[in-house]
Amino acid sequence: MAERSGKITAGQAYIEVEYDYEYDAKDRKIVIRQGERYLLVKKTNDDWWQVRPDENSKAFYVPAQYVKEVTRKALMPPVKQATGLPNNSMKTIQSMHLQRSTENVNKMPELSSFGKPSSSVQGTGLIRDANQNFGSNYNSGQTLNLSLDLTHNNGKFNSDSHSPKVSSQNRTRLFGHFPGPEFLDIEKTSFSQEQSCDSAGEGSERIQQDSESGDELSSSSTEQMRATTPPNQGRPDSPVYANLQELKISQSALPPLPGSPAIQVNGEWETHKDSSGRCYYYNRTTQERTWKPPRWARDVSTSRDFQSPGEQEPLSSEENYHSSCFSQSDSQCGSPPRGWSEELDERGHTLYTSDYTKEKWLKHVDDQGRQYYYSADGSRSEWELPKYNASSQQQREIIKSRSLDRRLQEPIVLTKWRHSTIVLDSNDKDSPTTTKLCLPENESPPTSSKHQDPGQEKYGLLNVTKITENGKKVRKNWLSSWAVLQGSSLLFTKTQGSSTSWFGSNQSKPEFTVDLKGAVIEMASKDKSSKKNVFELKTRQGTELLIQSDNDAVINDWFKVLSSTINNQVAEADEAAEEETPDSPGVEKHDKEKDQKELKKLRSMKGSSMDSSEQKKTKKNLKKFLTRRPTLQAVREKGYIKDQVFGSNLANLCQRENGTVPKFVKLCIEHVEEHGLDVDGIYRVSGNLAVIQKLRFAVNHDEKLDLNDSKWEDIHVITGALKMFFRELPEPLFTFNHFNDFVNAIKQEPRQRVTAVKDLIRQLPKPNQDTMQILFRHLKRVIENGEKNRMTYQSIAIVFGPTLLKPERETGNIAVHTVYQNQIVELILLELSTVFGR
């Protein structure tokens, strides 16, 4: 998180946190604290603002009501005055040197530590001038030499001779480009101290600040404090430093030398138990012993992955060892420790699963607010998660495979707002100067500004149901879902309640995602849903959705936005398809086989780790496969896939069949006139919907259709399929643009109605006129046999009125429109010879 003080970049807008807030993102927890400051990126809406800690970090969202926008003047850090040290607070420290190694150190902002200036000095701590800001033009190959001498001079601090000194010729770039605090890039630091101690012997001990507990001494291979005890001097019960009051040097606190085989080995460190059963750690190379788990060094190549291309310089083994050490408690920084995966169990507790042994541990907090871990079976409890001996190569493979799996399963990640690589534990009260370095375990920083998450384009509450999933029909189940259009993907999650946007809600993971690439969108027919304002979305993967809203304006807006998004995706895909799509239909089969091979290969790779070369090869093949694969519309335009009969445009269908009346319409009419004119309730009685769907499927797939087959012996199945054909037309037989004209015509005087309707029919396209003529002549013959089938002009008009004539957008006048629709059909049937001639 951001610091509460530090240098401010000129010309930028900043916000300051007024209240604490936290929420769960996809794979981490976003936490902001009162007083923290961030760089304002964008005021997304009234509820959420987009911010980031610095210009090089990933942006994330904060609630606008919890922050305030501040000016540069308000953000400038105050000038701190040096405070005198009391006589009894600190003994004379002869010399204290903070010396930077003269070796050439690589500049790595991701591995920087926070320099955390103390707000006040109350007799303890090392004093630092708040105005001591270093320039940004330091050479990373030069040496920083800081000398800080604190003398016990009558209780006063000698600022003239003992203030920090920085050589103008030996400076190093210490601070990253962050808008908040300054960042001290300390990769290898050693403290040397000469002072009085309790013990009379001579020797050296290694101590380390422990931010979690002050009751035990700990040592680390990355930060070492050496305390030399001169003879004939003593300081009973006095702290080593004034700001390290809890740490005391005690020769007897060291663990014993190992006398039995190691319980566990991790690199150079071995885990042993003493006679009381307490675990301690022993380094075979340096012979260090410590009660606290050491910080493991990260692999050189892994550390370099976090550098930008322009900053990659070779590190010496020692420098890399010291600059790449991490605390095991990585989960406190927002991500689980390396080698562990994090999830929530059914009770909402944080559950960690080992990537090596599949062992499960739970995280808990004791009554003092300290975090600890216990195994799922309750047999063990530790302050830190167990560490397992895994080679750096295996760790990289697990990291890479996990990252690949996540991208494949969840193509759009909305809540992963930032790639935070450095987190300062601001709640660490025991050790104000302790810093923690946290790097993401399964991702690398973006190499350019182009890799930003796409912005939110549209969101809102919609009713949605799936009718087909992966080519298989599913039961319709309408749900009220929160929809978010993000780039080329449409995401659905549960209702957000009072939240007005996707961001910041606890429901950060979408229920399902729809890929709009190659999708088809159209208004749904009545047989798909009886609801109003429904449109159908068909994806390239074989999923069909019905999306609905009671608000006409909302559904029309969504329809336009989704149509525009789909058209943009089709245009981009067609450009690639024109260059690389094969011209021969025979290659389509080869492409399908190749697709299946690629998918099988992809599934096998998900379960196993891959080395770097294999992963690069797979990414390249997958990218090539996705870019070369043509969209459904492009293949259909080339003639490889024929359009279906049901749901096709009438003019296109007639053009494809080289006629003006669809063949299926002729076939149904001939069959009904031959076998069904005397059937009671013909066209009014509904047929078996399942059999009708089978007939529809057979027609759409160009199967040889014989209506005299026993499968179609029910005449109501034939009439039901004919009515379904006209219902599923994208534009009804009486086209949308003439609907109001037909309604106005039927409102005229009886003598003028026929002429007006006749003139309007002549304005329709030729396929519409011819199909209308053959259909109405057939219905006239059905009515003429009314003594047998009991069908009248009114009953036929009621059946076919809403099917053949309907407005483009349903309004509140459905009942009135239904009356007009029936009257128009009835008028044409009564005046058939006048309208169409004999």
From Swiss-Prot:
Residues 10-72 form the SH3 domain. The keyword Phosphoprotein applies. The modification Phosphotyrosine is found at Y241. GO terms for molecular function: GTPase activator activity. SMART domains: PH (SM00233), RhoGAP (SM00324), SH3 (SM00326), WW (SM00456). The record marks R684 as: Arginine finger. The keyword Phosphoprotein applies. Keywords: GTPase activation, Phosphoprotein, Repeat, SH3 domain. This is Rho GTPase-activating protein 12. Residues 572-582 have a biased composition (Acidic residues). PANTHER family: RHO GTPASE-ACTIVATING PROTEIN 12, RHO/RAC/CDC GTPASE-ACTIVATING PROTEIN. It comes from the Eukaryota. Residues 155-239, 291-346, 425-456, 572-620 are annotated as: Disordered. The modification Phosphothreonine is found at T228, T229. Residues 291-302, 586-601 have a biased composition (Basic and acidic residues). The modification Phosphoserine is found at S163, S199, S211, S213, S238, S584. GTPase activator for the Rho-type GTPases by converting them to an inactive GDP-bound state. PROSITE patterns: PH_DOMAIN (PS50003), RHOGAP (PS50238), SH3 (PS50002), WW_DOMAIN_2 (PS50020). The lineage of its organism: Eukaryota, Metazoa, Chordata, Craniata, Vertebrata. Residues 466-567 form the PH domain. Residues 155-172, 189-198, 303-334 have a biased composition (Polar residues).
